[in-house]
Swiss-Prot record:
Keywords: Repressor, Ribonucleoprotein, Ribosomal protein, RNA-binding, rRNA-binding, Translation regulation, tRNA-binding. GO terms for molecular function: rRNA binding; structural constituent of ribosome; tRNA binding. The gene is rplA. One of its GO terms (cellular component) is cytosolic large ribosomal subunit. Binds directly to 23S rRNA. The L1 stalk is quite mobile in the ribosome, and is involved in E site tRNA release. GO terms for biological process: regulation of translation; translation. Belongs to the universal ribosomal protein uL1 family. This is Large ribosomal subunit protein uL1. Part of the 50S ribosomal subunit. The keyword Ribonucleoprotein applies.
Length: 231
């Protein structure tokens, strides 16, 4: 088990376990506690008042974070013809069709996001057992199956994050890195929150935003007072 630094111990002792912190204070505490030797990711979880067992209450989508994710995203695109050239010009790292499918079947998965034009889905569909478990399968709900592949590439490169409720009705997403300014993390948080609020299912009843927490890869997890966020 990794040793806990004295500083992190002190920070943990300064955080009240049952206290709900204002979002600005929570972000500041998480940043302060991110003392690992790498640039930790800053993550947020939203516990939502939905029933994920019902298909009409599953939330899934994507949003471009205004300050980016702090991560270099490698993008693979399944398309052909003029779209292939447009994807390359937009910054796609890998562009192909049957040849790209063959590369993936051979185990070459050096990318973080897969985008496909609708005409390519007959090929991409055959890769479901490979891409699906890795969360890479293109889906129109998150904008990765689209006739405008160039725009999708630009969004992915600009810091687009995908979100989806898990089996417990919780959305987990990254809003940046510990090296980000507090104001930038807050701006990204607000953009993600806005997207999730707008995605509220009509069938969802009662309180929608039940719990919120902010954390870093190796640091603290801070519970957030939902009244402190603009929802």
């Amino acid at each position: 088990m990794a040793k806990v630094s004295k500083r992190l111990k002190a920070l943990r002792s300064s955080v009240e376990a049952n206290k709900l912190y204002a979002i600005d204070e929570a972000i500041a505490l998480v940043k302060k506690a991110a003392t690992a030797k790498f640039d930790e990711s800053v993550d947020v979880s939203f516990n939502l008042g939905v029933d994920p067992r019902k298909s009409d209450q599953v939330i899934r989508g994507s949003v471009v974070l205004p300050k980016g994710t702090g991560k270099i995203t490698r993008v693979a695109v399944f398309t052909q013809g003029a779209n292939a050239e447009a994807a390359k010009e937009a910054g796609a790292d890998i562009v192909g069709f049957e040849d790209l499918a063959a590369e993936i079947k051979a185990g070459n998965l050096n990318f973080d996001v897969v985008i496909a034009s609708p005409d390519a889905m007959r090929i991409v569909g055959q890769l479901g057992t490979i891409l699906g478990p890795r969360g890479l399968m293109p889906n129109p709900k998150v904008g990765t199956v689209t006739p405008n592949v160039a725009e999708a590439v630009k969004n992915a490169k600009a810091g687009q994050v995908q979100y989806r409720t898990d089996k417990a009705g919780i959305v987990h997403a990254t809003i940046g890195r510990a090296s980000f300014a507090e104001a930038d993390l807050k701006e990204n948080f607000d953009a993600l929150l806005d997207a999730i609020v707008k995605a509220k299912p009509a069938a969802a009843k009662g309180q929608y935003l039940k719990k919120v927490a902010v954390s870093s890869t190796m640091g603290l997890g801070i519970r957030v007072d939902t009244s402190s966020v603009n929802n």
